[in-house]
Amino acid sequence: MAETLEFNDIFQEVKGSMNDGRLRLSRQGIIFKNSKTGKVDNIQAGELTEGIWRRVALGHGLKLLTKNGHVYKYDGFRESEFEKLSDFFKTHYRLELMEKDLCVKGWNWGTVKFGGQLLSFDIGDQPVFEIPLSNVSQCTTGKNEVTLEFHQNDDAEVSLMEVRFYVPPTQEDGVDPVEAFAQNVLSKADVIQATGDAICIFRELQCLTPRGRYDIRIYPTFLHLHGKTFDYKIPYTTVLRLFLLPHKDQRQMFFVISLDPPIKQGQTRYHFLILLFSKDEDISLTLNMNEEEVEKRFEGRLTKNMSGSLYEMVSRVMKALVNRKITVPGNFQGHSGAQCITCSYKASSGLLYPLERGFIYVHKPPVHIRFDEISFVNFARGTTTTRSFDFEIETKQGTQYTFSSIEREEYGKLFDFVNAKKLNIKNRGLKEGINPGYDDYADSDEDQHDAYLERMKEEGKIREENANDSSDDSGEETDESFNPGEEEEDVAEEFDSNASASSSSNEGDSDREEKKRKQLKRAKMAKDRKSRKKSSEGKKGKDPNAPKRPMSAYMLWLNASREKIKSDHPGISITDLSKKAGEIWKGMSKEKKEEWDRKAEDARREYEKAMKEYEGGRGDSSKRDKSKKKKKVKAKLEKKSTPSRGSSSKSSSRQLSDSFKSKEFVSSDESSSGENKSKKKRRRSEDSDEEELASTPPSSEDSASGSDE
């Protein structure tokens, strides 16, 4: 027989909400840990009095009763697990795990039985439903009625608000069945009534959340916060954890009370009650109980008369009444010697405390993250201009918390702490490459060389120089944005001619070198622009006279049916119209679609016929264009063979016109294709006289005639 049994995905009903967790049975007892809150139910083996197995909504359930009247119910078991649990109970707890079915007759009359902290409504020997009396918040009586109201759980999608019982009168004298019923409920119910005197009162305590100053009255079963505007009554059963945290300035203390369910102020929910104390403030406290009652109730944890620091008195009383341990920071110590780290969360600055089993951030908004719910952490490096880093935590549920603006000096301490707690570090490979002193990270400020930043600065300078050069030399450059008949080779020829013209000028050696450097830059930029334009011109250069592609059957039908769809659905958007048309097309019968398929086939045949005619006419024109291009290239090669006379003619033509154009450039424009002639006919007729005067002086004509020979 196994010493322990463990079950995952077991559910516990808490005021209408099903919370999942893990159940572990051992020789010593039964432990259930809530996955959401981390709360642990620990049932000692000697306290168990009864175990019941029954069918419930989530499969099968286990109901446990203890000697002090507490009832624990866990659901989510499989039917096959009964034998294993039954044998375990017999062997280790010496209890018989009984099977008991619920009544499903649907009757609304029966017998009410009170057992421990449970109200059971039975029909015969079978229970119909059970009500934990600790969930009752109010009990009121009428003539023959008793009404129970319940505490609400914000996590429950559907909540039970109240139950009303009709109690018939009896013939017994002196016994009121309605009052007897109500007293049985109130004796075990969690009804918050400020009856009697408080055990003690703390006056005008500073509260950070909810903000204000409150008088705290300590009652046996609940805590009463009384402020100028709001009152809060907090049952001790809703307190999950207590934290006592020293402030970074070493002069103040935080006392944090974790609550589930939270207290509410309008639509705002407070999961944490945070009190702020000064270490220098002392108090003398006298409990409103005699010494015998104090000794019997608190067993030496409290005395009738106590004195000391205010924060010590509050924490000591709360620990005794709530019966929870107080969590304090562990052995973590930051760069400044404090047990916390200054950082920012969301829009507010606060303090992050690394604890032995989690992290807690105070104070706005307070956050508590347990180690067992952390998936991984990440050290996010800050920018090069800051001296800080970010600490990111992602939970197993996918929630991410980012604590930013942490001083870089805290990096080493925090990294060592996370490593010691064996938390998964997302960027571990990067961090293990850092030396133990973390000097490389610590020196990552604005003085460090950033190669990417330097490269961006250099590129910006080059762009600025090019912009200045283009504005200074605008008289020497031609319009590069309009060269429709020009190839990439023509760009190089144009700049070569400019280079020769500048070299023949009467400038110094340094000016010539500077001019060549600028011209090479411009040539490179022009080539880049040409390469970018080339891809776009491929799309823009589509012949408008070419036949259009045929439409598909769906598009033909859509164009014909568009107006009808609009009239059937007035105000429909384009997107919705397309979706609606797609739905109609899918729902059409095959016979109706065949009509549009035939139309699409006819359109395809017409397109193929038109394309053949178009390709035939285009082939003849392309042959003529190729022959003209060959003549153009031949003329350029011949011109290169006689550069001396050409250069002198260029220098003389430059004095006449700011924009230089050689004769072969003019002639190449004149010998362009028939398509370009029709577009540029009007422009050439206006500029022909100016080009003859400015671009072809007598010396240029002589050189051209010499090359033709």
Curated annotation (Swiss-Prot):
> Which lineage do the record's taxonomy fields give for this organism?
Eukaryota, Metazoa, Chordata, Craniata, Vertebrata
Q: Which family does it belong to?
A: Belongs to the SSRP1 family.
Q: Write the gene name.
A: Ssrp1
Q: Where is this cross-link: Glycyl lysine isopeptide (Lys-Gly) (interchain with G-Cter in SUMO2)?
A: K90, K296, K364
InterPro entries registered for this protein in UniProt: HMG_box_dom, HMG_box_dom_sf, PH-like_dom_sf, RTT106/SPT16-like_middle_dom, RTT106/SSRP1_HistChap/FACT, SSRP1-like_PH1, SSRP1/POB3, SSRP1/POB3_N
The Acidic residues compositionally biased stretches are: 470-496
One biological-process term from Gene Ontology?
Answer: nucleosome disassembly
> Partners and quaternary state?
Interacts with MYOG (via C-terminal region). Component of the FACT complex, a stable heterodimer of SSRP1 and SUPT16H. Also a component of a CK2-SPT16-SSRP1 complex which forms following UV irradiation, composed of SSRP1, SUPT16H, CSNK2A1, CSNK2A2 and CSNK2B. Binds to histone H3-H4 tetramers, but not to intact nucleosomes. Identified in a centromere complex containing histones H2A, H2B and H4, and at least CENPA, CENPB, CENPC, CENPT, CENPN, HJURP, SUPT16H, SSRP1 and RSF1. Interacts with isoform gamma of TP63. Interacts with FYTTD1/UIF. Interacts with SRF. Interacts with NEK9.
User: Organism source for this protein?
Assistant: Rattus norvegicus
Which segments show compositional bias classed as Polar residues?
Answer: 696-709
User: What name goes with this protein?
Assistant: FACT complex subunit SSRP1
Q: Which SUPFAM superfamilies match?
A: HMG-box, PH domain-like
Q: Where along the chain is composition biased (Basic residues)? A: 515-533, 625-634
> Modified residue N-acetylalanine is at which positions?
A2
Q: Which residue ranges does the record annotate as region Disordered?
A: 458-709
Q: Where is the signal peptide?
A: none
**Residues with the N6-acetyllysine modification:** K233, K413, K542
**Molecular function (GO) terms listed?**
chromatin binding; DNA binding; histone binding; nucleosome binding
